[in-house]
């Protein structure tokens, strides 16, 4: 198991507070959103995997925001299509 130091990840993000927010968002994505890890899992928990991804520069706040916006737009489009289908079939 590769050791992750918080300091390495803090240097990528800027401060510890943002690191907590970003790493928890990413860990939640992997746990509940079915998102795959971008680094080898090596039997690590999702929180450690998230920190490793941040440390390697694979995850940033901007990237998470963009992915979430895209997913929300796709979900909104699917819901709109479903509603449109229902109203046209009446």
From Swiss-Prot:
One of its GO terms (molecular function) is DNA binding. One of its GO terms (cellular component) is DNA-directed RNA polymerase complex. Its EC number is 2.7.7.6. SUPFAM superfamilies: RPB6/omega subunit-like. Belongs to the RNA polymerase subunit omega family. Promotes RNA polymerase assembly. Latches the N- and C-terminal regions of the beta' subunit thereby facilitating its interaction with the beta and alpha subunits. The RNAP catalytic core consists of 2 alpha, 1 beta, 1 beta' and 1 omega subunit. When a sigma factor is associated with the core the holoenzyme is formed, which can initiate transcription. This is DNA-directed RNA polymerase subunit omega. It comes from Aliivibrio fischeri (strain ATCC 700601 / ES114).
């Amino acid at each position: 198991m590769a050791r992750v130091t918080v300091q390495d990840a803090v240097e990528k993000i800027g401060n510890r507070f943002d690191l907590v927010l970003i790493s928890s968002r990413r860990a939640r994505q992997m746990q509940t959103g079915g998102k795959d890890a971008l680094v080898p899992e090596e039997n690590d928990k999702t929180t450690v995997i998230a920190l490793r991804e941040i440390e390697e520069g694979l995850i940033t706040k901007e990237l998470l925001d963009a992915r979430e916006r895209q997913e929300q737009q796709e979900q909104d489009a699917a819901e709109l299509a479903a509603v449109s289908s229902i109203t046209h079939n009446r």
